[in-house]
Amino acid sequence: MVAKKRNTLRSKVSARNSQNFGPDVANNGILDESYDIESDPRAFLHQPKETKKEKLLNRQNTFLSNLKGKSTLNDGIAANFDGISKSSIRRRKRKLREELKPRMQDLLTSLEQEKDLRGIIENSSKDMNNDDDIDMDSKIRFVDTKEMNLKKIEPGSVRIKKNQPNIRNQKGAKALAANETARFNQVLTNQDFQKNPFGALREVIKLQKQ
């Protein structure tokens, strides 16, 4: 077999390059410096790119900034929840809500104090008008035996009666809400409540604690 000459192959390649790129191409196939790089369709590959580490760092920074922004949107208390899990935040907020709920025992004691203050004011006015008269009602207090036998209930606790809707599920909560609104409207229209609101509240609380 006769081997082909290398000179003929080189001449063919140089002739083909000269046809594609023009006369500025050298015989060895290297382009001249005046060749425009932007005309190359793959020129964007040579542009600087963002590395994987930089992408990961940017994502972490944006995530942390979003968390801080959400924490400061609410109250000033929420700003102290940075770096705390969502479950612990929910527990703390639930505890704060429980502390804000009205307590029946505190309301009863405040009503008793208000009643005692009214009695003291009335007694003092009577004593100023009648110094010689003795008011026996101010010194003698009748105590009901049922009131003495009442068990002490922790403040903030609510007695769950039988045959009542369960507040833990959605259906029971709706039923309880409807009952409470109906009872609230009934209380507002009650004549005893309109005449003496504190006395009516005191009696209702005593009945509920029995």
Curated annotation (Swiss-Prot):
The UniProt entry's GO biological process terms, in alphabetical order, are: maturation of SSU-rRNA; maturation of SSU-rRNA from tricistronic rRNA transcript (SSU-rRNA, 5.8S rRNA, LSU-rRNA); ribosomal small subunit export from nucleus
InterPro entries documented for this protein: Slx9-like
From start to end residue, where is composition biased (Polar residues)? Answer: 10-21
Copy out the induction comment.
Answer: Transiently up-regulated during the initial 15 minutes of dough-fermentation.
Q: Which UniProt keywords apply?
A: Nucleus, Ribosome biogenesis, rRNA processing
A GO MF term: G-quadruplex DNA binding
- Which N-terminal stretch is annotated as signal sequence? none
* Family assignment from sequence similarity: Belongs to the SLX9 family.
The record describes the protein's role as:
Involved in ribosome biogenesis. Required for normal pre-rRNA processing in internal transcribed spacer 1 (ITS1). May be involved in the movements of the replication forks.
Name the chain's protein: Ribosome biogenesis protein SLX9
Q: What is the lineage of its organism?
A: Eukaryota, Fungi, Dikarya, Ascomycota, Saccharomycotina
